[in-house]
């Protein structure tokens, strides 16, 4: 299995010539803009999804997508992964266990237009999975610890290099139970950032029950569903949740905290 270097200081963005207007005057300048490119995910030689993503950490993205979308149930079902930049985009090829591949073919997903959001690309509402199984997480109920949330909120900005440079990226951070940020991934799509993090957890052999996810975005349905499917016990977000995200989190036993700041947060499930 090949893995790209995890050096992202100047990747994921490009510099463009712009005209900057301020206080009635104009001047030529340069601006850094986040990159967005089509990424095709290919399973056992068959293209399954094409999504728009920041071209960073794509092998983590593919593994996380496979797990969070239920294509594979565990890391051991992924045998090999390779990635290349081709035809103006990127292609990530995964070799997965045959039973998982046969089940994937039966799901009748669209071969193009997927966004990674868990809804786009399905063929009917009947195929939409809104009934998650309870997560196999900690034995007791999980709730958001105020000190841990405050620490995560304080530490996250230092891990948002792409956002600071471009103003155009979401971050998904893995935090220890004490709230310390252990790793963070950025992408123009919040669901992509989370999939990259989920892929990293799987490839590093991390236990999802040993920490929580802290995100710079709102809490949407697909984020709650991805956390539920991969056994993450707590999702904390800076912005608001949707009603469906709250419902999914409650059904799955995922603790959900939003409007997370250093000074407080709102707990929607526990």
UniProtKB/Swiss-Prot annotation:
The keyword Nucleotide-binding does not apply. It comes from the Bacteria. Its main location: cytoplasm. One of its GO terms (molecular function) is sulfur carrier activity. The active site is at residue 117. Coiled coil: none annotated. The lineage of its organism: Bacteria, Pseudomonadati, Pseudomonadota, Betaproteobacteria, Neisseriales. GO terms for biological process: Mo-molybdopterin cofactor biosynthetic process. PANTHER family: FORMATE DEHYDROGENASE, SULFUR CARRIER PROTEIN FDHD. This is Sulfur carrier protein FdhD. It is found in: Cytoplasm. It holds the Pfam family FdhD-NarQ. One of its GO terms (cellular component) is cytoplasm. Residues 1-30 are annotated as: Disordered. Belongs to the FdhD family.
């Amino acid at each position: 299995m090949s893995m790209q270097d995890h050096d992202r200081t100047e990747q994921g963005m490009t510099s463009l010539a712009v005209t900057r207007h301020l206080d009635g005057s104009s001047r030529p300048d340069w601006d850094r803009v986040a990159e967005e490119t089509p990424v095709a995910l290919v399973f056992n030689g068959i293209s399954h999804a094409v999504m728009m993503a920041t071209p960073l950490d794509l092998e983590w993205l593919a593994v996380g997508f496979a797990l969070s979308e239920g294509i594979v149930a565990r890391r051991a079902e992924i045998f090999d992964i390779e990635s290349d930049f081709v035809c103006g985009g990127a292609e990530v090829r995964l070799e997965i266990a045959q039973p998982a591949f046969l089940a994937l073919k039966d799901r009748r997903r669209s071969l193009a237009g997927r966004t990674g959001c868990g809804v786009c690309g399905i063929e009917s509402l009947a195929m939409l999975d809104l009934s998650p199984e309870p997560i196999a997480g900690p034995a007791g109920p999980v709730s958001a610890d105020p000190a841990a949330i405050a620490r995560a909120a304080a530490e996250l900005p230092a891990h948002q290099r792409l956002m600071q440079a471009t103003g155009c990226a979401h971050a998904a951070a893995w935090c220890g139970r004490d709230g310390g940020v252990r790793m963070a991934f950025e992408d123009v799509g919040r669901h992509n950032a989370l999939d990259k993090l989920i892929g990293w957890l799987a490839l590093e052999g991390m236990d999802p029950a040993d920490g929580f996810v802290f995100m710079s975005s709102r809490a949407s349905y697909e984020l709650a569903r991805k956390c539920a499917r991969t056994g993450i016990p707590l999702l904390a977000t800076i912005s608001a949740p949707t009603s469906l995200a709250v419902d999914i989190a409650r059904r799955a036993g995922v603790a959900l905290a939003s409007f997370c700041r250093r000074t407080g947060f709102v707990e929607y499930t526990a």
